[in-house]
Amino acid sequence: MEMHLLCETMFTCRKNNILPVHLCILLDDVIHKEKVKAIEGIFFQCVFFKEKLVYTEWTKIKFTYVLHDLVISQIFKNACIKEVIHGALILSVPINIDNLHFDTDILILKIIYPHFLHDDIVIKLSEILSGAPRMQKTVEKKQEVEKPFFHIPAKLGDLTKEDPISFNHHGPLEPPSTVRGLKQSANVRHSHPISRPEKANVTFLSDSWYSQNLKCDFISDIQQRHVLVIFWYELSKGIQMQIKNIQIPPENLFSSITNYLDRVNTYLDEIAERTFRCITTNMEIQNRHLPQKFNSHFQIEFNCTHLISGMELARDFWILSLDRNSCVLKAMASHFLHKKKGRSSLSSNEFWADLIDCTTGKTLYGEKVRWQLNSETSLYSTFRKNQNISWELQPNCYALYMSENLKLYWVLPGGFCVSGTFKLKENDEFFFDWQFGMS
């Protein structure tokens, strides 16, 4: 756990109100080994209740990971844990403990991957701090060294006494403070032997770090998707800190948790409504005339009257599992990233795509798709990673495409398409700064 030792040393230099929380995120089906290798960064944010809810700024933290099994009791001599950890993310979080409210305050960890993918882990601070042990401070005896490295003799006269000066040296005729007539000894010099310090026994912090007492707590995040291990080291600064829990009115209980989840879910609901309002509006503008834009195959028994009911079914499947990986949000994130930093996430013929299979009810969100035009038919075919045939060639499959310049395409079976421009609102940029600003 060198990462914990490094962060402990860094946090010790900070203010006394900063609590170092050392933890591991166990690998699972969501955060697995291949996904861990692609992590671009980890950020944290706290939500505190101080008369009103306060969201701290996103702060990047150091991390490392292990993909092999860890036996903590073999690493730490005095660890009270026998479980084997099958791979983990290892990190430390500095938390401000001023005015803590255990009932409301939460910690949010955001793990960033390429292509605007991220995982949010929301943890109650009370879950973290409830297991903190009350250990007595370990006082290590200082090594007694008889003579320090820079040795100053006890008698200052040895350092301040001037050497006699020989007349044979081309100095002044008479040395200062010399009484005339006093016989001087020529070429007399006093030697001062160099004081060498005795070899001291040096104890490194890492030696004591691995021999200290250690307590581990297993906790889960709010959504019960991940398991985390909290490490309480005997030598950690956090063991000695006094943490005070401030009570709040009952009506404000769990306000930060619900506020965070509601901010995300409410915005996703709004995006779903705006997306299909854009589609239906442009369908009316096109007078319900849907041009064929993609190369596709028709089933022999295909009935065009089923298109409307199929559209409603595909819409419901899309909304049912809608999350921040949707092509609409990724296209908006690409748009704001290009606007602020001049970076393009897509080439001219690439789009973000949500692919809906009405046969199985499953939706693939946020796929990167490339369009290729057939010069003979003037129809497009789509290509993506691990795709054998164009999505539009599969029956009962719908697609939603969106470009970096916010051009939206709703594609039906048969390659028919409704297109329009997705319009931004004032709160969009604020949401994306909050959720994607660190990308």
From Swiss-Prot:
Bilayer-crossing regions: none
A single cellular component GO annotation: host cell nucleus
InterPro entries for the chain: UL17-like
Keywords, in A-Z order: Capsid protein, Host nucleus, Late protein, Viral genome packaging, Viral release from host cell, Virion
Record keyword Transferase present: no
Any Pfam family hit: Herpes_UL17
Superkingdom to which the source organism belongs: Viruses
Location relative to the cell: Virion; Host nucleus
GO biological process: chromosome organization
Assembly behavior: Interacts (via C-terminus) with capsid vertex component 2/CVC2.
Function of the protein: Capsid vertex-specific component that plays a role during viral DNA encapsidation, assuring correct genome cleavage and presumably stabilizing capsids that contain full-length viral genomes.
Family as reported in the entry's similarity comment: Belongs to the herpesviridae CVC1 protein family.
Name this protein carries in UniProt: Capsid vertex component 1
Taxonomic source organism: Human herpesvirus 7 (strain JI) (HHV-7)
Gene name linked to the record: CVC1
